[in-house]
Amino acid sequence: MIASIRGILIAVAADHVVVETGGIGWMIYAPRPVIAALGDIGATVRLFTYLLVREDSLTLYGFETVEQRQLFETLLSVTGVGPQAALNLLSSGTTDELRLAIATGDVTRLARTPRIGKKLAERLVLELKGKINVKGLPTGAAVTPAVAAANAELSEALISLGFTDAEAAAAIAALPSDAPPDLEERVRLALRYFSAS
């Protein structure tokens, strides 16, 4: 597998770039924000790549970070999600926003992405529930020390009830911003999140 490519940017299109290294120009498909961030033609660039091998083609996909590439691979594991749909999802916002939308079951946000309808958005949430790493994801609002302490307490309570770290983090991310600091009420809200998903 070709893990990354570093070279001179020699061409830019809407959905791909060409990077020359060692006298070879590599056509690399990438999310739109990645293409926009590469800079001008002639710049030295580095992309973390994923090589998709099919019976009739070898296609390279490029990403800004290893985490973004891993998320692309995770998206491809979902039935019905091909490389173009995965690129569209990665182009629809930041990697953290996409991970949070999947972890919190935000089907409406996912379905707004081109080539992703409501059914495929629901399948994404269903098949990736618990597989998306939600540690360190923003929860929307700035977290005060009191809220952070309440979230840590809630996480411990949910884990003691048998939920995984990822499930606990997803439930915490889904809490409303005006959730009371009381542990009992926060557990009740988190359990409502699990029963709704």
Curated annotation (Swiss-Prot):
Listed Pfam families: HHH_5, RuvA_C, RuvA_N
Keyword terms: Cytoplasm, DNA damage, DNA recombination, DNA repair, DNA-binding
Region (Flexible linker): 146-148
SUPFAM superfamilies referenced in this protein's UniProt entry, alphabetically: DNA helicase RuvA subunit, C-terminal domain (SSF46929), Nucleic acid-binding proteins (SSF50249), RuvA domain 2-like (SSF47781)
SMART domains reported for this sequence: HhH1
Main location: cytoplasm
One GO CC annotation: Holliday junction resolvase complex
TM annotation in the entry: none
Single GO BP term: DNA recombination
Gene3D superfamilies per UniProt: 5' to 3' exonuclease, C-terminal subdomain, DNA helicase RuvA subunit, C-terminal domain, Nucleic acid-binding proteins
Localization terms from the record: Cytoplasm
InterPro entries tied to this protein: DNA_helicase_Holl-junc_RuvA_I, Hlx-hairpin-Hlx_DNA-bd_motif, NA-bd_OB-fold, RuvA, RuvA_2-like, RuvA_C, RuvA_C_sf
Disulfide partners: none
Region (Domain III): 148-197
Region entry Domain II, spans: 65-145
GO MF annotation list: ATP binding; four-way junction DNA binding; four-way junction helicase activity
Domain I: annotated span: 1-64
Quaternary context: Homotetramer. Forms an RuvA(8)-RuvB(12)-Holliday junction (HJ) complex. HJ DNA is sandwiched between 2 RuvA tetramers; dsDNA enters through RuvA and exits via RuvB. An RuvB hexamer assembles on each DNA strand where it exits the tetramer. Each RuvB hexamer is contacted by two RuvA subunits (via domain III) on 2 adjacent RuvB subunits; this complex drives branch migration. In the full resolvosome a probable DNA-RuvA(4)-RuvB(12)-RuvC(2) complex forms which resolves the HJ.
Family: Belongs to the RuvA family.
Job description of the protein: The RuvA-RuvB-RuvC complex processes Holliday junction (HJ) DNA during genetic recombination and DNA repair, while the RuvA-RuvB complex plays an important role in the rescue of blocked DNA replication forks via replication fork reversal (RFR). RuvA specifically binds to HJ cruciform DNA, conferring on it an open structure. The RuvB hexamer acts as an ATP-dependent pump, pulling dsDNA into and through the RuvAB complex. HJ branch migration allows RuvC to scan DNA until it finds its consensus sequence, where it cleaves and resolves the cruciform DNA.
Entry remark concerning the domains of this protein: Has three domains with a flexible linker between the domains II and III and assumes an 'L' shape. Domain III is highly mobile and contacts RuvB.
HAMAP family per UniProt: DNA_HJ_migration_RuvA
Protein name as annotated: Holliday junction branch migration complex subunit RuvA
Gene expressing this chain: ruvA
